[in-house]
Amino acid sequence: MRILLYNIRYATGTGPAFHLPVPGAGYLRSNKQVLADITQFIKNEDPDIVGLVEVDTGSIRTGMVNQAEFIAAELGHYSIYECKYGTESINTLVPIVRKQANAFLASPRVHGERFHYFDTGIKRLIIELELEEAVVFLVHLSLKYRHRQAQLRTLHELVRGSSKPVLLAGDFNTFWGDHEIYLFMQAAGLKSANTASLPSYPSHNPRRELDFILYSAGIEVTNFRVPAVRFSDHLPLICDFEIRAGAASAAA
């Protein structure tokens, strides 16, 4: 199976023009060509599971286009998405912001889906996708170190409580790379698919390892790469893996 993780920055693009006429102005402008390029890239990679971070689910920025559904339709995938700020956040009332989400797109048979929420941080959503033989979590962790550490504790409980092998993917915002989550991985029984610690941010000159695909016992990674495509400020991660026979029953 293949999982592709990509923080697509709401398909707003990159480059100097993103910060014109004022810094960050590009967040208010989605680009149809960028969305088309991202979609074609994902389609060419033919993943079984896609984890999208920073996806617009139909605000005025995109002309009411739900980016998760648009990409899923092109792939022939099932989609699941939710606002990343939590049900009680004031951000759910703010135009554009309330449509900022994370999403799973999946071709395998989906056995269940759940939304969990962190107790701290602005970005609180955890999406759980249950497949026949594994569970996949998608996250976008806080920019604040203290909040990230609290969020990792929540993730530890979810991972250890799973009765199936686990994949945990997302933008961890770890400014110190895998050093910051080393103890978490040890405690949760997870390994990083990115054994070479390849950086994923910023896409034009990658220096930081912010994005991760982690996996538990029962899963064997057969290939991992970070394609050098610059449709977003992050680079995507692609991981090929196999679930060992009987791993789900053993985990239970």
Regions found by a protein language model. Name each.
Residues 1-4, 12, 107-111, 122-138, ...:
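Beta-strand-turn-beta hairpins that frame and shape the catalytic cleft
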Residues 1-74, 81-89, 244-252:
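N-terminal, active-site-proximal structural segment of metallo-dependent hydrolase catalytic domains
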Residues 110, 115-117, 130, 147-149, ...:
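Metal-dependent phosphoester-hydrolase catalytic domains
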Residues 64-69, 150-156:
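Charged helix-capping and loop-helix junction motifs
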Residues 25-31, 115-117, 142-146:
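Short, flexible loop segments at the rims of nucleotide/cofactor-binding pockets, characterized by
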Residues 54-133, 225-228:
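Structured beta-strand-rich core segments of catalytic domains in phosphoester-bond hydrolases
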Residues 7-8, 55, 141, 171-172, ...:
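Active-site metal-binding loops of divalent metal-dependent hydrolases
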